[in-house]
From Swiss-Prot:
Keywords: Cytoplasm, Methyltransferase, S-adenosyl-L-methionine, Transferase. Belongs to the methyltransferase superfamily. TrmY family. PANTHER family: TRNA (PSEUDOURIDINE(54)-N(1))-METHYLTRANSFERASE. It is an enzyme of class 2 (transferase). The keyword Methyltransferase applies. The lineage of its organism: Bacteria, Pseudomonadati, Pseudomonadota, Gammaproteobacteria, Vibrionales. This is Putative pseudouridine methyltransferase. Transmembrane segments: none annotated. Signal peptide: none annotated. One of its GO terms (biological process) is tRNA methylation. InterPro entries: Alpha/beta_knot_MTases (IPR029028), TrmY (IPR007158), tRNA_m1G_MTases_N (IPR029026). GO terms for cellular component: cytoplasm. It comes from the Bacteria.
Length: 199
């Protein structure tokens, strides 16, 4: 099982703002693009992939929306509009939830009022965490554990205080090359490397 976490620091937790944020400061299109490139392949979708989108621009709690490729039945297509609609349905389903509550949205999609920090602490129990860093080991040379989880951010970098807690969780740094890439581009390269290795 391969897992991805997108920490979307600018992404709002209100459906109207998600839809209005495409191409604006929130850059909510990154949610759809990352989701598309993690789960979908031509005429099908990948098995054994989990994607966690953590939306952090909120008045109450972050929303962690989880997509399980093995459980998803019909997401409505893999174009930007359909994928953002799935995110919106999850956000709408989360209204009225208290902190650290979980709710099933539809097959393969759950929403939790859970922070990024709490999520990665939970994932670290049975995954090896990897963070993108230009100074990390180049992915083609890096040793990738059996249950990898890759941590990505939107256009707002990971806050410095997060690095220490991620280090304590045993997070390893890997590099995808000399250029800074979009999260949606990172997942294409990561998936390709894992495919070539026969993961």
């Amino acid at each position: 099982m391969r897992s991805f976490v997108l920490r979307a620091r600018a992404a709002p937790t209100e459906s109207k703002l998600i839809l209005e944020g495409v191409g604006q400061d929130a850059h909510t299109e990154i949610l759809a693009h990352t989701l598309m490139n993690t789960i979908f392949v031509a005429q099908s979708h990948r098995e054994n992939v989990t994607v966690h989108l953590v939306l952090e621009s909120t008045k109450d709690f972050s929303r962690t929306i989880t997509f399980d490729s093995n459980e998803i039945t019909n997401i409505g297509g893999f174009h930007e509009s359909a994928l953002l609609s799935a995110v919106v349905r999850a956000v709408d389903a989360s209204q009225g939830m208290i902190k650290e509550q979980t709710r099933q949205v539809e097959p393969g999609i759950t929403v939790r009022t859970m922070s990024f920090e709490k999520l990665v602490k939970e994932l670290a129990e049975d995954h090896q965490l990897y963070m993108m860093d230009k100074k990390g080991d180049f992915i083609r040379d890096a040793e990738i554990a059996e249950n990898p989880c890759f941590l990505l951010t939107d256009h707002i970098p990971m806050p410095k205080k997060s690095y220490n807690s991620l280090k304590r969780l045993g997070t390893e740094k890997i590099s995808l090359g000399p250029n800074m890439l979009f999260a949606s581009q990172c997942v294409v390269l990561i998936n390709n490397e894992l495919d070539v290795r026969g993961f």
